[in-house]
């Protein structure tokens, strides 16, 4: 299993610079898709005799004044001259048999069960059931016999006479079968996903197929979801849907979990995947409402300077760029804050807006390169790195030209090696002049990371940290490189340095969780994930639906499912849930102490 912290935590198998991947494990299944879907909140075990659509249609046929199949709006009427008889079971058995016998004459088949199956076939293959206002025609039953119009009388007797007693007997037998199927459905259909999974685990155990590793456990879970036609991610449905439907049927869900004050807003926000930040702020953020004429950018900078909530600062900066789209500093800081929060897509958007306003700010190009790497957009990342190195060291343009001659063929592999030569050459020239640049070392570290040379990447970041020991972002990059180099203990030390410099660095906490998962410390992983969620999920902001929050919850569910093998805790973990309640549940389960934000 591969787990990545931050952007696209579980859906993207590629390793990322400011995020890390669980090592010594296989690539994650594509089952865990990134976008939100409304999934079923309740899963029924499949019926073995009839499909669910057939079963529903048959039950409707039995009911009083019920149409055949869910798509039919009105009961079927048989027009015979001036008389209309409705094909329902509302009248006597004799009347029903009489009407059915009349219908049967239109069909070349005499067996009731055969005709019943053919009606289901037609109902599933076409939409003619929707047009029952039209005169009933023979083609409706898929047979090439008479073609009836609304004024054609249906003969009440036929050469293919049916034994009405036998027909009634068959109908009664079918009714008994239907009732039995309904009871079986009630017995199995009300089971939650967790209960079905527990039963499946018992079956695997009895068959001697218990998982020997976390990877096997994960694969069995995904196979179970697929075989039961359960949504890839059954817990990412909107909170209100989960509360109204799942809570009614799942005894494992405690109502206290819905105590979070902003639960009502999450439903609408979770469906807005584009421009989610700017759309949410003006209607749901108390932070903006409380400004009372104060410049939101000034207030945001005060929060950042004094160690206030960075999620609140993000909301204020979003408001600032909304009021003044030409505010360069607001866009620049918005990109930096979302870097801390782990919202890569918004980082790119903000930095691109800043570059439009000031293309001479080369530091933005380096930051953009990192974000592109995190989104596996290596071509764009290389463009940013080349722009940075060429414009930062114009005195070496002739040297860059000579390097270009060695890489005439244009492809991504050559471009990456060419950029490596650019940065190595500059680093060498600086060393000859007894100089060094932390930016050059950081850029070289990014390139080594893209080449998957993680130990060399870590060496570059260590060199950069000699000049910038208080740069929490560099410490996080060092930790990411070490994690992917399978040096998780060293990585945790780097992450701890980053957290000590910026306690609200969400990406660091999620990366720390990954290293703890690699080390088998699932309690610590859960602790850091919950702490990261608390930073984002502030009841006074509308950040609950941002991408990093959704990904943190997704990773937390995996920790509970795979590390703790607790489907109960996993089912209670989704954006908007009450983290204090989950901590209490976890404490009861493991004797694990609650965690305060550092």
From Swiss-Prot:
Q: What Gene Ontology cellular component terms go with this record?
A: cytoplasm; cytosol; peroxisomal matrix; peroxisomal membrane; peroxisome
Q: Name one GO biological process term.
A: protein import into peroxisome matrix, docking
> What is this protein's function?
Receptor that mediates peroxisomal import of proteins containing a C-terminal PTS1-type tripeptide peroxisomal targeting signal (SKL-type). Binds to cargo proteins containing a PTS1 peroxisomal targeting signal in the cytosol, and translocates them into the peroxisome matrix by passing through the PEX13-PEX14 docking complex along with cargo proteins. PEX5 receptor is then retrotranslocated into the cytosol, leading to release of bound cargo in the peroxisome matrix, and reset for a subsequent peroxisome import cycle.
Q: Which Gene3D superfamilies match?
A: Tetratricopeptide repeat domain (1.25.40.10)
Q: Does the keyword Secreted apply?
A: no
Mind telling me what this protein is named?
A: Peroxisomal targeting signal receptor
Q: Where is the composition biased (Low complexity)?
A: 80-90
Source species: Schizosaccharomyces pombe (strain 972 / ATCC 24843) (Fission yeast)
Locations listed in the record: Cytoplasm, Cytosol; Peroxisome matrix
PTM notes:
Monoubiquitinated at Cys-7 by PEX2 during PEX5 passage through the retrotranslocation channel: monoubiquitination acts as a signal for PEX5 extraction and is required for proper export from peroxisomes and recycling. When PEX5 recycling is compromised, polyubiquitinated by PEX10 during its passage through the retrotranslocation channel, leading to its degradation.
Ranges for the region named Amphipathic helix 4 (AH4) are 193-209
Q: Tell me which domain of life the UniProt entry assigns to the organism this sequence originates from.
A: Eukaryota
Molecular function GO terms recorded: peroxisome matrix targeting signal-1 binding
**Per the record, what about its domains?**
The TPR repeats mediate interaction with proteins containing a C-terminal PTS1-type tripeptide peroxisomal targeting signal (SKL-type). The WxxxF/Y motifs mediate interaction with PEX14, promoting association with the PEX13-PEX14 docking complex.
Placement of sequence motif WxxxF/Y motif 1: 96-100
PANTHER family, per the entry: GH08708P, PEROXISOMAL TARGETING SIGNAL 1 RECEPTOR PEX5
Cite the residue spans of the region called Amphipathic helix 1 (AH1): 8-30
């Amino acid at each position: 299993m591969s787990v990545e912290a931050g952007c696209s935590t579980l859906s993207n198998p590629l390793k990322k610079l400011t995020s890390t991947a669980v090592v010594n494990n296989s690539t994650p299944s594509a089952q865990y898709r990134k976008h939100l879907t409304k999934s079923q909140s309740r899963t029924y075990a499949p019926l073995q005799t009839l499909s669910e659509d057939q079963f529903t249609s048959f039950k409707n046929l039995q009911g009083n004044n019920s149409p055949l199949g869910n798509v039919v709006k009105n009961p079927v009427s048989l027009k015979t001259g001036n008389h209309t008889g409705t094909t329902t079971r509302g009248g006597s058995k004799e009347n029903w048999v009489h009407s059915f016998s009349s219908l049967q004459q239109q069909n070349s088949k005499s067996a009731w069960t055969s005709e019943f199956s053919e009606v289901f076939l037609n109902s599933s293959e076409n939409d003619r059931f929707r047009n029952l206002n039209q005169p009933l025609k023979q083609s409706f039953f898929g047979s090439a016999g008479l073609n009836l119009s609304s004024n054609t009388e249906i003969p009440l007797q036929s050469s293919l006479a049916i034994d009405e007693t036998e027909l009634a007997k068959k109908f009664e037998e079918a009714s008994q079968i239907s009732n039995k199927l309904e009871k079986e459905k009630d017995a199995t259909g009300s089971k939650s996903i967790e209960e079905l999974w527990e039963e499946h685990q018992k079956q695997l155990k009895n068959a001697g197929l218990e998982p020997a590793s976390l990877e096997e456990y994960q694969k069995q879970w995904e196979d179970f979801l697929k075989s039961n036609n359960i949504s890839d991610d059954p817990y990412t449905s909107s909170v209100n849907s989960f509360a109204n439907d799942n809570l009614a049927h799942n005894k494992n869900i405690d109502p206290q979990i819905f105590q979070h004050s902003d639960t009502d807003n999450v439903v609408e926000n979770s469906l807005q995947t584009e421009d989610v930040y700017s759309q949410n702020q003006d209607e749901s953020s108390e932070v903006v409402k409380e400004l009372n004429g104060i410049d939101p950018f000034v207030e945001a900078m005060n929060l950042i300077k004094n160690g206030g909530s960075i999620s609140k600062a993000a909301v204020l900066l979003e408001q600032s760029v909304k009021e003044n789209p030409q505010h360069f500093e607001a866009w620049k800081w918005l990109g930096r804050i979302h870097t801390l929060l782990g919202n890569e897509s918004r980082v790119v958007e903000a930095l691109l807006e800043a570059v439009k306003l000031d293309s001479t700010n080369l530091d933005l190009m380096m930051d953009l390169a990192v974000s592109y790497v995190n989104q596996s957009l290596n071509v764009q990342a290389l463009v940013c790195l080349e722009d940075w190195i060429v414009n930062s060291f114009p005195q070496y343009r002739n040297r860059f030209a000579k390097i270009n001659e060695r890489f005439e063929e244009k492809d991504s592999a050559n471009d990456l090696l060419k950029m490596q030569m650019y940065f190595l050459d500059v680093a060498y020239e600086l060393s000859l002049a007894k100089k060094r640049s932390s930016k050059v070392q950081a850029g070289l570290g990014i390139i080594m990371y893209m080449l998957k040379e993680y130990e060399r990447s870590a060496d570059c970041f260590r060199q950069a940290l000699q000049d910038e020991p208080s740069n929490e972002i560099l410490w996080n990059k060092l930790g990411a490189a070490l994690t992917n180099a399978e040096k998780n203990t060293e990585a945790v030390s780097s992450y701890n340095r980053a957290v000590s410099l910026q306690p609200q660095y969400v990406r660091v906490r999620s990366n720390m969780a990954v290293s703890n998962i690699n080390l088998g410390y699932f309690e610590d992983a859960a602790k850091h994930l919950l702490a990261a969620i608390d930073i984002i999920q502030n009841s006074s902001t509308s950040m609950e639906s941002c991408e990093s929050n959704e990904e943190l919850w997704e990773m937390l569910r995996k920790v509970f499912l795979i590390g703790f093998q607790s489907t109960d805790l996993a089912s209670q973990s989704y954006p908007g849930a009450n983290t204090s309640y989950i901590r209490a549940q976890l404490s009861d389960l493991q004797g694990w102490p609650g965690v305060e934000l550092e």
